[in-house]
Structure formats: C-alpha cells, structure tokens
Curated annotation (Swiss-Prot):
Keywords: Aminoacyl-tRNA synthetase, ATP-binding, Cytoplasm, Ligase, Nucleotide-binding, Protein biosynthesis
Alphabetized PROSITE patterns for the sequence: AA_TRNA_LIGASE_II
Catalytic reactions of this protein: tRNA(Pro) + L-proline + ATP = L-prolyl-tRNA(Pro) + AMP + diphosphate
Comment block on domains: Consists of three domains: the N-terminal catalytic domain, the editing domain and the C-terminal anticodon-binding domain.
Assembly description: Homodimer.
Gene3D superfamilies in UniProt: Anticodon-binding domain, Bira Bifunctional Protein, Domain 2
Coarse class of the protein's main subcellular location: cytoplasm
Localization terms from the record: Cytoplasm
Origin species: Alteromonas mediterranea (strain DSM 17117 / CIP 110805 / LMG 28347 / Deep ecotype)
UniProt name for this protein: Proline--tRNA ligase
C-alpha cells in the first residue's frame, strides 16, 4: 500500500478529551474518528488491526469446533420478556419501537436470540453438542462512554454459545473454549492472565475472565508467583495466617483522638496490621408467613483487620446480608452501635457480627472500647465468633493453591467465559428428546471476546513515547518502506520501487511511504502507527548497496545488503 493512495490521517497533537493512552494514540495514529459520544468510525489502519484480531479469533474458534453464524442486531422484545431480562436489564439496554409500535432492542448480548434459534432448529440429542458463534456489532447505552473504544456504546464482539444435554459435556466444551482463548491471546502476542471470576448479571456458576495486563487496567488481578493460579481480586480467596498466641497481658483502655481511624490508631501508637475495624452493612430482608419479601431494619457488623479492604462480593454471600451490599452512613452506624464506629468494641457488638479470618487470627489487638474517644489494646477474641473470608487479597498473601505468594497487577478484561447452566434454556423452554424419549432441558455455555476492546488493550500494553508498538500478528502492516527524499533522487526511487514490488509479490503487507515529506515526518508517522519493522533507503547507504533495517519494538538497527533485503523481511 502506498501512502499517496492511502488515508493515513495521522495527527501531531494529542486530543484534549482523550484520557487514556490507547484513545490518544488511536486518534493520533489515524485509526479511529469520533462520530458521537461512544461511537467511532474505523479508519483504514484501525480496521486492518480490527480485522486481524477478528481473523485470529475466527481461526481458533473454528479449530475448537465452533460454527460461525450471524444474528440480527435488532431483537424483538418478546424474547427478552420470555427470558425475564426485559425487566431485569438496566438502562444500558437501548429499547426502540418500529412504525407499528412494537418493542425491539439493540442487542448488547444474544442469549435470547441464540436460545430461540436452537429451540426451533434442534430437536434430538443426536444433534448435540452444538457450539455457535458470531463476530458482530453490539450496542450498550453506557451512561458515561469513555476511554475511546475501551468503553464505547457500539463495539465489536465475538460471542459464542454452546448447548449440551449433560453438564459433563458442557465442562468439556468449556475447557476447549478456555484453551482456545489462551491460544487466541498468545497468537496475538499479548501478556494476559486467565482468572477465576464472578459470573455477574449473565448468570451461571463456573466463570473465567481473560485480562491483558496493563497499568491502566480497571481490574486488579491476583496471581501466584509459583503456579498458574490467577483470580480477579474480587474472587481471590484470602488465606488466613496462623492464629497468633495471646501474650497474657491485661486489656488496657487508652484515650484516643483523630479525624479518621488511622489517625486514631496513630494517637495510641497502634499498628493497623494489629488492629480491627467495624463496617456496618444493611441486613437482608425477611420473608413473612406468605413468603413475601419484607423490608426490615436490620444491620450486620463486618469486622476486618484495619489495613484490609472489604470485598463486597464476598460479603454479599453471607446469609443475612442484603444484596446489593449497602454500607451504613457514619450517622446510621453511630445510632446502631451507640458510638462512633471508630470506637466500637469489635468483641461486643449489639448486632450480628462476622469476623474476617485474618482479623480473627490476631492476638493482643487494638479495637474500640465502646465509648467515645476510648480504645482498648491487648484485646483477644472470645470463643464462638463467626469467622468468614470477606477481604480483598493483597500482594504477598499466600496463594490459595498453596504454591508461592500472590502478586497483584492491573488488567483489562478482553474475554469472559461462563457455564450458564439452564438459566435461559429453562426460561425459554429450550430442550430436546433424550435417548429415552423424554424432553430434557439443555445446559448452556457462553463465551465472549471483546474484539474491538483487544485493539485498545494491546495499545495500552504496547506503546512508548513515540507511539504504538504493535505485536507482529495484529499490526496493520508488517513493514514500512521509507525512502528518504525519493522525489529528489532517481536511484532511491528506483531502489524503493523495486523492493516494494518484490515484497508485495511475496504477499508481505508493506506501507510504502511515497509522500513528498521530510524524512523526520515520515519516521515520526511510522513510529506513531507502530509498524513492527521498517526499511530505510538513503543516499549514503545506497552508495554501498545497503539499506537500514529497524525493529520498532526493540529499537534494533542493522545494515542489510539491498540484494538480501527481500529475503530478510520475508523471514521476519
């Protein structure tokens, strides 16, 4: 491809509204242009990358036995009513009416459509298992689209859905999809982790997320130093330390002051690692004699080590805790506890209490004394406390699998797989005749990859101050051909044209910069776009029948004989 015949569309300045580096570089490198909030046009360079990502996804899905289909973006509302999600789904679901005032949605996911399809097309166990996928545009009406295509309203996604008679068969396909996802991200040259995850609103039991590691990632990933264990911090089990042995020292009450809990601890020379804090949360509703949900004014106390953070997902799994988790305000906590929560005695609370295992392992710890401005030190737990895991793990914690310690890095979620079970198939009566001739509801799996999100995530992981540093498999072009002052030198033009034709004949993707531009502009643009390899043709090197090769990722430079350049590039 010649730049003179291409929409290069690079920009020198960083757009003011672009917050993250991937958004900035995608705009500056001429990959995308904003049409409206959360909506982007893909320009040629961006589309080339997007298509390469999608092709790798397709190849690995096909290899794993999945079959490609294409479903409508617009979906009838009656399918969503049938599944129960018409009422459950939030304002992210864009609802529209046609000219006949019939309700439709712009699909954010396709569980309903695929379940209806299989319900109508599959009637016998002999047609199973079946795994169908598509690569298609989705729409979610994000309340605050941001970070460019990272969190846009319209995006490209690969979503696959598998159908099975037995859970054991689902587990086999789930493992195939897990392996396929690992192959996909490995082929793209990305540093990623597959982590144990929460199934969220989609539903189901078993779930893994796939994260591209990047400092700008929204999610915290915990993984073992010595094994393959990895989990979202929200899901990682916290291994409690061995229980400390009390010294036998008497409990001592001290005066304390401070605007926050850390200041209070500091005022009595207490360490947060050997102190506990009380978090008051709303209790769950109760059922009346008719089985109806009755809102009750109950509260539950959660006790953690003072330096640890409460994990909402873990806390919501405690019987008696309201879902979603609702923390009491400072004034509410003060009214319920009879004292500021900073000075509440964690060993003697007026409401049901659950103690995190790491806090329960403490001895001679510091807690409130149950009176304003007072704390107790050298406190130990009474018998019979309720011990739970309700904290986020931290770096240095023991790995839950017993191998090594945990490290924590930021990650960008680019894939998610679920064992859905029968959530949708039961709601939509999707089943087949089993071998015994009885109707059997199918069990399902769901497997998503954010195709367009991968493009942004790859940039977040692969860039420098000059621009993007694409991994070879997803780069828009393999090599940039940069002839310096070609329009002033016949022999440079001749050498460049000849090499370009040779490389194209080999099927190599080349961006031939044949613009009438200064060499500095050409170099800057090629580095900004992030093409992995470049060949520079200049007068001085051409005197020796040589050209210069540069590797964008490593910065390596070397001189090549012009006659050997074609073979060198082909071997990259």
């Amino acid at each position: 491809m010649r730049t003179s015949q291409y929409l290069l569309a690079t920009q020198k300045e960083t757009p003011a509204d672009a917050e993250v580096i991937s958004h900035q570089l995608m705009l500056r490198a001429g990959m995308i242009r904003k049409l409206a909030s959360g909506l982007y046009t893909w320009l040629p360079s961006g589309l080339r990358v997007l298509n390469k990502v999608a092709n790798i996804v397709r190849e690995e899905m096909n290899k794993a036995g999945a079959i490609e289909v294409l479903m409508p973006v617009v979906q009838p509302a009656d399918l969503w009513e049938e599944s129960g999600r018409w009422e459950e789904y939030g304002p992210e679901l864009l609802r529209v009416k046609d000219r006949h005032q019939r309700d439709f949605v712009l699909g954010p996911t396709h569980e309903e459509v695929i379940t209806a399809l299989v319900r109508n097309e599959i009637s016998s166990y002999k047609q199973l298992p079946l795994n169908l996928y598509q690569v298609q545009t989705k729409f979610r009406d994000e309340v605050r689209p941001r970070f460019g295509i990272m969190r846009g309203r319209e995006f490209t996604m690969k979503d696959a859905y598998s159908f099975h008679l037995e859970d054991s068969c689902l587990e086999e396909t789930y493992q195939k999809m897990y392996d396929a996802y690992c192959a996909i991200f490995s082929r793209m040259g990305l540093d990623f982790r597959a982590v144990i995850a929460d199934s969220g609103s989609i539903g189901g039991n078993h779930s893994h997320e796939f994260h591209v590691l990047a400092e700008s990632g929204e999610d915290a990933i915990a993984f073992s130093s010595d094994s393959d264990y990895a989990a979202n911090v929200e899901m990682a089990a916290a291994v409690a330390p061995e229980k400390a042995v009390p010294s036998g020292a008497d409990v001592e009450t001290k005066d304390a002051k401070g605007k926050d809990f850390n200041a209070i601890l500091k005022s009595v020379d207490a360490n947060a690692t050997n102190a506990v804090k009380v978090v008051l949360v709303k209790g769950a509703n109760e059922l009346n004699d008719k089985g109806e949900d009755v809102v009750c004014d109950k509260w539950v106390a959660l006790v953690l080590r003072a330096d640890h953070e409460l994990n909402d997902i873990k806390a919501e799994k405690i019987d008696g805790v309201a879902i979603p988790l609702v923390e009491a305000s400072f004034e509410q906590a003060k009214d319920v506890l009879g004292v500021s929560p900073f000075f509440a005695d964690a060993t003697n609370l007026p409401v049901p209490a659950y103690v995190d295992a790491s806090a329960a392992a403490l001895a001679d710890f510091t807690t409130g004394a149950g009176a304003g401005g007072k704390v107790n030190v050298n406190v130990n737990w009474p018998d019979g406390i309720n011990t739970v895991d309700i904290r986020n793990v931290v770096a240095g914690d023991a790995s839950p699998d017993g191998q090594g310690t945990l490290d924590i890095k930021r990650g960008i979620e680019v894939g998610h797989i679920f064992q859905l079970g029968r959530k949708y198939s039961e709601a939509m009566n999707c089943g087949v005749l089993s071998e015994t001739g009885k109707h059997q509801t199918l069990t399902m799996g769901c497997y998503g990859i954010g195709v367009s999100r991968i493009v942004a995530a790859a940039i977040e992981q692969n860039h420098d101050k000059f621009g993007i540093k694409w991994p070879d498999p997803i780069a828009p072009f393999k090599i940039a051909l940069i002839p310096m002052n070609m329009h002033k030198s016949h022999r440079i033009k001749e050498a460049a044209e000849a090499l370009y034709e040779e490389l194209v004949a080999l099927g190599i993707e080349v961006l031939f910069d044949d613009r009438k531009e200064r060499p500095g502009v050409m170099f800057n643009d090629m580095e900004l776009i992030g093409i992995p390899h470049s060949i520079v043709i200049g007068e001085r090197n051409l005197d020796n029948q040589q050209v210069e090769y540069k590797n964008r990722r490593t910065g390596e430079k070397q001189l090549l004989d012009l006659s050997a350049a074609k073979e060198f590039v082909a071997a990259l």
